Amino acid sequence: MKRLEGKVAIVTSSTRGIGRASAEALAKEGALVYLAARSEELANEVIADIKKQGGVAKFVYFNAREEETYTSMVEKVAEAEGRIDILVNNYGGTNVNLDKNLTAGDTDEFFRILKDNVQSVYLPAKAAIPHMEKVGGGSIVNISTIGSVVPDISRIAYCVSKSAINSLTQNIALQYARKNIRCNAVLPGLIGTRAALENMTDEFRDSFLGHVPLNRVGRPEDIANAVLYYASDDSGYVTGMIHEVAGGFALGTPQYSEYCPR
């Protein structure tokens, strides 16, 4: 029997990158996966690929710019399937043109990004937990970032918002542990998604990798493997974890890249 047989999962922003890889991993293990996304056309392409791999997936409309859809997507899935077992909060964003350091960054944009990213966990979790309680438990997996625990020279809004998600993760974990609802966060490092690669120079990438002991850019599947672990009963005695999946980034001293060159 597959690890997630009979389970119903929701994955936000799941038509590409980490979200898509996570949806595919959950479906491969038997979950019925709802792709929460803006574009039904893009979602259907992923659904077709999942079907080819022997899995089952469906589309539910979600748009981070339409706050009410955080709740409506959950309610639509619960109404259609009668249960929700797994929630993967993958959505997160910034504005590379305005999210800079404290004095150079745009103040209004700082608070917009903070609100956007925190509510991307708060609202769907709040909506899903009552449905998880009805079926005796569930698992919430929040996608954060290594930048939430290692300060950055830029992207202050993104990093602070993801730090808040780490705290929210642990608060949810504690508050609902007695209901058998687990909540964990996965913190990606440098992952080779299109969005990430389009926003970095080769020079930046090489400099960053100098501080990654495993000496490679991560793959979306690396994150999906962690998501699958927390979604399944393999982690049935684990909650409140802030799990870095970053190739060992920041393990070394500041001189690491000098004394252990690539």
Curated annotation (Swiss-Prot):
- In its UniProt entry, the species of origin is given as Clostridium sardiniense (Clostridium absonum)
Name the catalytic site residues. Y158
Q: What is the effect of changing R38D?
A: Loss of catalytic activity
This chain's function reads: 7alpha-hydroxysteroid dehydrogenase that catalyzes the NADP(+)-dependent oxidation of the 7alpha-hydroxy group of 7alpha-hydroxysteroids, such as cholate, chenodeoxycholate, glycochenodeoxycholate and taurochenodeoxycholate, to the corresponding 7-oxosteroids. Is also able to catalyze the reverse reduction reactions.
- What's the superkingdom here? Bacteria
Can you name this protein? Answer: 7alpha-hydroxysteroid dehydrogenase
Q: Which residues bind NADP(+)?
A: 13-18, 38, 63-64, 90, 158, 162, 191-195
* Single biological process term from Gene Ontology: lipid catabolic process
Q: What is the lineage of its organism?
A: Bacteria, Bacillati, Bacillota, Clostridia, Eubacteriales
The UniProt keyword set, sorted, is: Bile acid catabolism, Lipid degradation, Lipid metabolism, NADP, Nucleotide-binding, Oxidoreductase, Steroid metabolism
> Which chemical reaction does it catalyze?
cholate + NADP(+) = 3alpha,12alpha-dihydroxy-7-oxo-5beta-cholanate + NADPH + H(+); chenodeoxycholate + NADP(+) = 7-oxolithocholate + NADPH + H(+); 3alpha,7alpha-dihydroxy-12-oxo-5beta-cholanate + NADP(+) = 7,12-dioxo-lithocholate + NADPH + H(+); 7alpha-hydroxy-3,12-dioxo-5beta-cholanate + NADP(+) = dehydrocholate + NADPH + H(+)
How does temperature shape the activity of this protein? Answer: Optimum temperature is 40 degrees Celsius. No activity is detected above 60 degrees Celsius.
Per UniProt, subunit arrangement is: Homotetramer. A dynamic equilibrium between dimers and tetramers seems to exist.
